[in-house]
Amino acid sequence: MSSFTSKFADELIANAAYIGTPGKGILAADESTGTIGKRLASINVENVESNRRALRELLFTTPGALPCLSGVILFEETLYQKSSDGTPFVDMLKSAGVLPGIKVDKGTVELAGTNGETTTQGLDGLGDRCKKYYEAGARFAKWRAVLKIGVNEPSQLAIHENAYGLARYAVICQENGLVPIVEPEILVDGSHDIQKCAAVTERVLAACYKALSDHHVLLEGTLLKPNMVTPGSESAKVAPEVIAEHTVRALQRTVPAAVPAIVFLSGGQSEEEATRNLNAMNQLKTKKPWSLSFSFGRALQQSTLKTWGGKEENVKKAQEAFLVRCKANSEATLGAYKGDAKLGEGAAESLHVKDYKY
């Protein structure tokens, strides 16, 4: 039983439930300056503040897109940015019924005593930062822990360390009014089969919920952002129905019914793959006490980015590409995606990056 008694408890529960509204999901636009620089470089656009702002403004002002979203995760820079007409992005999102979120981790560092496994930094001063972000309008937060599958990985040490880091982050967020998104990402890198991924996912999620319980985290005021259960990147692909079955079973075995929603990361899948897999999960006839939705970054932005190319004259077309993906994923949260989205440039290409750094 959680003994959590934050003054924010009712607000946390309401906001977590709202983010998990079927038909809506999260746009992850919280790429660090370095990561968004790589995205911009792929379309030959310079990584300067004005270009980063232009890309985010393109996304946030797309007609018809925001009704498909319940939240947008921002990088600290974007939390304080304004659109070209002077409207703060936070106000723009809130007026459209979209909750602003904030990435609060400080990236990964190697975990001593392991074979290249990592732990996530950012707990120092986290309470003060959360307080500041809440005052700036943020209502949820994200912290990414990263695990990998190998012959002996993930080690028990890495699982424990990352689970407890996520739990400490979660309770600090809740003390300061932010709904924590708990993100234990198991990288798709490797040649393992889907059964191996399922077994590891179950181990990791079980450890996370034990840690959250130990820290008295209010589960009704949290969200889970896991990987889908898939074969490794060097293995043969399987059908969306197979991914759906293995993923939902792993979640049934480990995620308490008190959690309102599970928002999947795309993990380097192509835009279309990620949507089809989410749709298959929502079509599955089985027990699902939580809503199943999306928190996609690359899988919502790739075709938009390619279409835009940094050119003002392409903004309208790029926004049309973004709307296509938003609508497709909105339908997938209802199990209603027909696979008929007009595929923009790059929509079918794998977005996998080995050992991905966010």
Curated annotation (Swiss-Prot):
Inducing stimuli: By glucose, fructose and sucrose. Induced by abiotic stresses. Induced by cadmium.
Name of the protein in its database record: Fructose-bisphosphate aldolase 6, cytosolic
Family: Belongs to the class I fructose-bisphosphate aldolase family.
Subunit structure: Homotetramer. Interacts with TRX1 and TRX3. Interacts with GAPC1 and VDAC3.
GO molecular function: copper ion binding; fructose-bisphosphate aldolase activity; mRNA binding; salicylic acid binding
Tissue: Expressed in roots, rosettes leaves, cauline leaves, stems and flowers.
Activity regulation, free text: Total and irreversible inhibition by S-nitrosoglutathione (GSNO). Partial and reversible inhibition by oxidized glutathione (GSSG).
Sites annotated Necessary for preference for fructose 1,6-bisphosphate over fructose 1-phosphate: Y358
Phenotype on disruption: No visible phenotype under normal growth conditions, but mutant seeds have increased germination rate in presence of high salt or high mannitol, and decreased germination rate in presence of abscisic acid (ABA), glucose, fructose and sucrose.
Top-level lineage group: Eukaryota
Pathway assigned in UniProt: Carbohydrate degradation; glycolysis; D-glyceraldehyde 3-phosphate and glycerone phosphate from D-glucose: step 4/4
EC annotation from Swiss-Prot or TrEMBL: 4.1.2.13
Protein's UniProt keywords contain RNA-binding: no
Keyword Lyase recorded: yes
Main location group: cytoplasm
Sites where the protein binds substrate: R39, S266, G267, G268, R298
Modified residue annotations for S-nitrosocysteine: C173
GO biological process: cellular response to hypoxia; gluconeogenesis; glycolytic process; mitochondria-nucleus signaling pathway
GO CC annotation, single: plasma membrane
Species in which this protein is naturally found: Arabidopsis thaliana
The gene coding this protein: FBA6
Pfam families on file: Glycolytic (PF00274)
Record InterPro entries: Aldolase_I_AS, Aldolase_TIM, FBA_I
Catalysed reactions listed for this entry: beta-D-fructose 1,6-bisphosphate = D-glyceraldehyde 3-phosphate + dihydroxyacetone phosphate
Sites bearing N6,N6,N6-trimethyllysine, chain numbering: K354
Locations listed in the record: Cytoplasm, Cytosol; Nucleus; Mitochondrion
PTM info: S-glutathionylated at Cys-68 and Cys-173.
